Amino acid sequence: MEIFHSIQGEGFHSGTPHVFVRFGNCNLRCDWCDTDFLTFDEQSIDSIVDQVISYDCDRVIFTGGEPAMQDLSPIGKRLKHHGISLSIETNGTMPIDPVIDWICVSPKDQLYPNVSIKQRLGDELKVVYCGQDMSMYDDLKEGFTHHFIQPCYIDSDTVEQNGKSFQIVEKIVKESPGWRLSLQMHKWMGIL
């Protein structure tokens, strides 16, 4: 696990400061994931809470890896006691603890056809576009208030390869007004 204070670079809360609590475990492995799965240490709930409140920020994002693999209730209740709003970025393959205030599901079923999305309700649906048919999300969209599409950006790809993904996403957003563009601003800014 790692804990750090930064600017949310994706989706609805893009541009706002948050404390990120990033867990290392995940039930999937996506090429574009920006999580380093090798450098995580386990921490006590007290240690996590102390680190989070030291940043004097009232917003936390549980991310990963897959944060829903953790029991977030004890940590979440303690943080809420300090007036902190809790968000989660999840692949949606596991139900989310009710202690969470904001649910962002970023489904990966375009890469893992045998994986089913269990968390079908939430605040934000954020799809990473990898060439899939966007109609596969028509039913899922109904359970979410905000719908974002994000071009797949792979650090090892060429500018041309990543640029092609950006152009396709631009076209999708123009032709499908129910989708809004999400870019990974933190990568452009060179921050976590």
Whereabouts are the PLM-identified features?
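Conserved Radical SAM active-site core
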Residues: 1-3, 17-23, 29-101
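Flexible, acidic/Gly-rich N-terminal and inter-domain linker regions that tether
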Residues: 1-20, 29-32, 175, 180, ...
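Bulky hydrophobic/aromatic packing residues
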Residues: 11-13, 51, 56, 102, ...
